[in-house]
Amino acid sequence: MDMELTKINFKPSFFSDRPLELLSDGEFSAIAFRYETGVCGLKISNKKCNMVVLPYMGQQIWFAEFNGKNLTQKSIFDQPQNTVKFGDNYGGLLLHCGLTNINCAESDEDYPLHGELPFANYQDTYTGIGRDQKGKFLVVGGTYDYRNSQEYHYSYSPQLRLYENSSVAEMHIDIYNHRQSSLDYMFMCHINWLAVEKSRIVYSAIKDRKHI
């Protein structure tokens, strides 16, 4: 079946220190609030999960709890900081990284760590209820338009889906190139899981500049 989607668009003025429920539909809920630092947060939940998305700060997923278990890394940040510097706000679960660059800038280069996406200020944001072949879902999404007069003009549109009675969330991403020339891009879905006691990290990439 084709996807069905009913959107509720919102804007920064909807967010304050008094939580505002933007959507309530059965087990689904979307609540807008503002942290003490001034950062906008959107708490979404179903019967099994709750997550906090930062709609105007790169659409980062700041926090996620599934089946009563916190999945988010422990850090020195108890809430998101009002900054655009990667290291000054490294506390969330998921960050979109890239697109025009992704690594650390050299001394003669000028671009932010992990590109422009982690702290992108989205022009279009929404929540809503949708349905596809997997069932009914709560959605949070938006579009970030990046313009550079000499090289780039693209739209980046992530969409986070939380399905009914499910402990699985899905991230869908669309990238649209507005120029006639091809768009060369780099992307990383940067996920910071909470460490599990006695866990073991398996690293398989060859350790040289060609593979890393």
Could you say what each language-model-derived stretch is?
Residues M1-E164, V168, S181-M186, W193-I212:
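Surface-exposed acidic/polar loop and edge beta-strand patches at domain peripheries
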Residues D174-I175:
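Hydrophobic beta-strand positions in extracellular immunoglobulin-like domains
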